[in-house]
Amino acid sequence: MPQPYDRVMSVLRLDNIGVFVSNLDAAIAFFDKLGLVLEGRQMVEGEFADACTGLTGQLCEIAMMVTPDGHSRLELCQFHRPAAAGNGADGPVNTLGVRKLMFAVTDIHDTIERLKAHGAELVGKVARYQDVYLLCYLRGPDGIIVALAEQLGDLS
């Protein structure tokens, strides 16, 4: 049986996850308190941007946040024009589409308290999965569902 690396592939890695927000500064502050690091911030507009997104005359500001290990990136984007379309942020956890971002944390309770100071609200409560994980869902900026997982024990 061929190993995954033996196949001809075009995907090298998952580069980033894009999250569209209404207040970029608030989103940066929230994810900073979670432990992500601001890697860069810039305005994006012009023919290349319009061609890529299919929007006409777009102007958006992006901020790239990176996890402490450097392996994962979160691209936060606030559109200045055209205005953002729709808001499914208040939908329940089982709404179709991308609904959550999960982060492994060292101390779930400390992380929750830091994020609550930036408007986060628990969706349910902190739950224990066997003796392996503490897990919870929070709502962050614009209703983004952020899941936290603190590993307690051996995964085997």
Residue ranges and their predicted role:
Residues 2-10, 41-43, 64, 72-77, ...:
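Vicinal oxygen chelate
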Residues 18-20, 102-104:
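Residues within well-ordered beta-strands of beta-sheet-rich folds
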Residues 59, 84-86:
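Short acidic (Asp/Glu) patches
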Residues 8, 13-15, 19:
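Terminal, regulation- and interaction-focused segments at domain boundaries
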Residues 11, 54-59, 92-95:
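A generic structural micro-feature
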Residues 14-16, 96-100:
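Eukaryotic phosphotyrosine signaling hubs
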Residues 20-71, 117, 136-139:
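Core segments of cupin and vicinal oxygen chelate
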Residues 22, 77-81:
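Short beta-strand-to-loop junctions in surface cap/lid or active-site-entrance loops
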